Amino acid sequence: VSEKGKNKIKKAVEELDYIPNQWIRNLYKKRTGIIGVMTPDIIHPYFSTLWNYLEAELDQYGYNVVICNTRGNQDKEREYLDTLERNLFDGLIVGSAFLSDEYYMNIEKPIISLDRIIPGIPLVTSDHHQGGILAGELFLEKGCKKVMCFSDPTRMELASADSARALIDVMEKHNREVIIESFQWEEVINYQLCMKRTRTLLDQYPDVDGIMALDLCAAAFLKTEKNKKILAYDGTYVTDFNYHSIDSIVQDAKKVAKESVNMLIKLINDQPLKKREVLVPVKYKKGDTL
């Protein structure tokens, strides 16, 4: 195009206030305009809340979102990662990671992890160490001597496991006992299975006087046993569905979404990250179960 022609086009663009089609922009930049968001299960209260915030944040950058629901299936997880490798996604935000570290480390595409600690992959997560300390201090304040806490059902290195470790440290310093139990993923997202497991555990540990569990499990304990101190961990809408409002350690899903999207956009645009790990503070929400 001649210089005269360029000037005519520029003038027409200015007069018409023309905004180039986003699809054309993406085509020019060799991008798809799509971000994959990988979740263990969209039915989980915290993840469904987080994904809503992620979608809103990504929309501000002109990105569409594809929810990649793995249900803990490694084959499905591998399929979504292959989709990223084939350039069908511009980037991936991972809330579910069951494949090996090596599998992720061999992918040279923009990835942000939301919990799993993977060498070389940037991490955005709640400050679970702070959450565990808060929980321990609350149980001590209420005079609890034996607390039951639920760990994540996977054996992977997860940032969220810090909450259990910090709780144990706080309680043991005061000669209090912490029992660690794990729910299977199906029990975490299925209320009936959760109820069945809670009854079994209460029969097994009748002298437990404090319980820290994910929101749905905490709600199940509340329905089964009202004489124990119950603290939910996540602090989603589930904690307000009962006759009693459940005391909660609340993860700031909105801030987690904002920080993870900001980091991912920088990776996509080949911009340097000031830090490769972001911890988002948690807070205590008072209810009437402690």
Task: Describe the predicted segments one by one.
Residues 1-31:
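N-terminal helix-turn-helix DNA-binding module of bacterial transcription factors
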Residues 199, 204-212, 217-290:
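Flexible loop/turn connectors
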Residues 30-137, 202-203, 207-210, 227:
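Alpha-helical recognition/docking segments in bacterial nutrient-uptake
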Residues 58-69, 164, 168-193:
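Short beta-strand elements in bilobed, periplasmic/extracellular small-molecule ligand-binding domains
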Residues 103-109, 168-173, 221-229:
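Glycosyltransferases and closely related glycan-assembly transferases
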Residues 124-149, 191-199, 250-270:
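Hydrophobic alpha-helical segments within soluble ligand-binding/sensing domains
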